Amino acid sequence: ARMAKSLGGPHGSTFAARVFGPAEQEALGLSEGNSSPLSAHKAASAAADFAAKEAFLKAAGTGLAGPFALCEIEAVRLESGAPEYRFSGGSARWMDERHLRAKLSLSHDGGMALAFCILETET
């Protein structure tokens, strides 16, 4: 409910651009000029994407004040439907410098979203 309110409010497009990367915005139908309200499923997906960002920041140990923007950490879906992280900008450099890869699991039900992030050292 909070995500739908944030995205549907008067500053929804600004919020979307600050929080969600291009692939997430496209998947959620948040492109500029699209003023249609978010469906319950899309709002739940947006909440899960946000939870994925929080899970990554916690696993990385940086918190929200970390060295990168939320829109640089994207939760995308593979053709199979499986979620996967896509990093850009500072988050991609941070991952590369540390030789890390991230695994992601998402779930949402009953208005709640849950994400798990596991960071592994590339070998």
Language model segments and positions:
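Core catalytic alpha/beta fold that binds nucleotide/phospho-ligands
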Residues: 1-123
